[in-house]
């Protein structure tokens, strides 16, 4: 059975509205190509039915919070945090790094999820939305949840793009961080640095060499805090 490591309903928000497909931009800067969201990040039977059901419940709990425009209550904050932790761990790259084998992944996912969730609730108690304006946009990728550190600061932010126009970040801070470049460029470069093979976008004109240059200039190294 084909199973998704990135929730299809969320990835659909990155479809090109004219093509109804997502643009896949290879990390090695080869020519981009488009595919339906339902055909991306699928793998055959990489997890057990029980684990698939456990993860589906996480995605279901998060759905109302994603739709809400106002401030989240405690239950909604928990649901969004669970979704972020799920997508931090479940992608193909993280599975290679966190687990020794597919069997190890299926046996230990729940315990690793709970461990990372507890750390996240402690270290990232505040969630903020950032809305992109004008022609700026956010990308996502096959490692959708990234952790970045604003230049000159010690604390990390955990971020993911909800859509091409909305970024969520989790932190322990009450003020938004300041960046020397547009937050869209900084986050997109971090998404590029963190991805395994592909950056995903609703646009064909994402410039991968530019993202690679920004990642080098700011010494962006993907990290998961422990």
Regions from the PLM with identified roles:
Residues 1-226:
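Alpha-helical structural context detector biased toward long hydrophobic helices
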